[in-house]
């Protein structure tokens, strides 16, 4: 697939990403195949008719999104197209969202959270900042592990964590491709690796939990201290390293492999290589949730129904997001498997441990590192 781009794989998609909070504009985007979930409902996603009516009466929805902007804007645009509900959206990292709603303490400035790994969602859940809701479309989830035991977040995709690298630069430097996490602490990679900020990025929290689950708490923290010696920069968002590899700024990155596919296929950066860790890949569950105290509760509930339908998630691969989908009536991204990703060939990630301890683990890591320095980016 050396010359394959999304332009000839899916066709051209045009979505304009806004700055700050922006209104989504109407689009005739293809919403993908749909399966009716309720023969008594004419709704496009199978949501209850009374919920649709109440949501339309509210007429507005504010979304904090932690997935990539192209996909985020596409799903917001389509929601407005389906229901005529005004949608405002702001792209923030998961860490930024978690910090913001904690500060707002039950009086959130947005209604729903969409995208980003569940580790920060679980921290917010443990603080009572997410609203419980049992959507009809949760029946389409392929496993109970893709929803919160508190019924306050629901999975929309599954992404594989791995190693990304600049093929051309490693060849120029006469360096081997790192095959596993432990290879990354080899001094020969000093100054060549980018990761993401443990305080702001959900991907970084996934990295912490992954190495602690692999090596144990103390050895896991020590691993991250050793890794830090080779890190040139910690980006605000988890997708930062993959973007920097594509542009040639970074040689090796730790991040989500679907972000690497986006760089190869959509941005045509053929220098990007993907490595699934030889000791076993970790993974994220990307989620969506309603904020406790949302000003537009019915529109928020309708959003959750929509997010768990093909009308929403089938837009992912048409807009540069190649994560595996976690509902049974969605169309899986074939391109991800063509690049060697397998949603089933992953470690047994302990979500319960991550839910209970992520916040403390972040504190432990930052304390071991002596606090952040200029490499830890917040913008």
Segments from the language model and where they lie:
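Mature extracytoplasmic/periplasmic domains
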Residues: 282-349
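Conserved C-terminal helix/tail region of periplasmic/extracytoplasmic solute-binding proteins
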Residues: 341-379
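Bacterial lipoprotein signal-peptidase II cleavage site
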Residues: 24-33
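A ligand-binding cleft/hinge motif common to bilobed small-molecule-binding domains
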Residues: 119-123, 251-271
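N-terminal secretory signal peptides and thylakoid transit peptides that target proteins
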Residues: 1-16
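Short beta-strand->loop
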Residues: 130-140, 152-154, 182, 265-266, ...
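Extracytoplasmic ligand-binding site segments that recognize negatively charged/polar headgroups
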Residues: 62-76, 88-104, 108-249
């Amino acid at each position: 697939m050396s010359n394959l781009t999304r332009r000839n794989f899916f066709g051209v998609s045009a979505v304009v990403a806004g700055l700050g909070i922006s209104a989504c504009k109407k689009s005739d985007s293809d919403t993908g195949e749909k399966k009716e979930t309720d023969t008594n409902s004419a709704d496009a996603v199978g949501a209850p008719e009374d919920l649709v009516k109440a949501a339309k009466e509210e007429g507005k929805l504010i979304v904090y999104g932690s997935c990539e902007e192209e996909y985020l804007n596409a799903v917001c645009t389509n929601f407005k197209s389906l229901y005529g509900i005004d949608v405002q959206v702001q792209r923030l990292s998961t860490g930024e969202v978690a910090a913001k709603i904690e500060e707002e303490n039950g009086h959130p400035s947005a209604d729903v959270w969409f995208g980003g790994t569940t580790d920060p969602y679980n921290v917010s859940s443990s603080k009572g900042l997410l609203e419980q809701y049992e959507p009809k479309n949760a029946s389409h989830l392929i496993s109970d592990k893709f929803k919160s035991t508190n019924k306050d977040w629901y999975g929309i995709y599954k992404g594989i964590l791995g190693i990304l690298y600049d093929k051309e630069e490693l060849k120029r430097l006469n360096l081997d491709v790192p095959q596993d996490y432990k290879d990354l602490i080899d001094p020969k990679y000093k100054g060549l690796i980018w990761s993401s900020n443990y305080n702001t990025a959900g991907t970084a929290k996934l990295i912490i939990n992954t190495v602690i689950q692999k090596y144990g708490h103390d050895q896991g923290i020590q691993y991250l201290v050793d890794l830090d010696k080779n890190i040139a920069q910690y980006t605000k968002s988890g997708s930062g390293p993959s973007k920097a590899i594509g542009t040639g700024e970074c040689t090796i990155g730790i991040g989500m492999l679907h972000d690497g596919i986006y760089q190869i296929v959509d941005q045509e950066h053929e220098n990007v290589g993907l490595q699934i860790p030889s000791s076993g890949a970790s993974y994220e569950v990307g989620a969506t949730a309603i904020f406790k105290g949302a000003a537009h509760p019915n529109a928020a509930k309708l959003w959750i129904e929509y997010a768990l339908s093909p009308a929403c998630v089938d837009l992912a691969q048409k807009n540069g997001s190649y994560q595996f989908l976690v509902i049974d009536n969605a169309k899986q991204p074939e391109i991800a498997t063509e690049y060697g990703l397998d949603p089933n060939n992953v470690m047994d990630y302990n979500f319960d441990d991550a839910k209970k301890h992520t916040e403390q683990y972040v504190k432990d890591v930052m304390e071991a590192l002596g606090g952040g320095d200029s490499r830890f980016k917040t913008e």
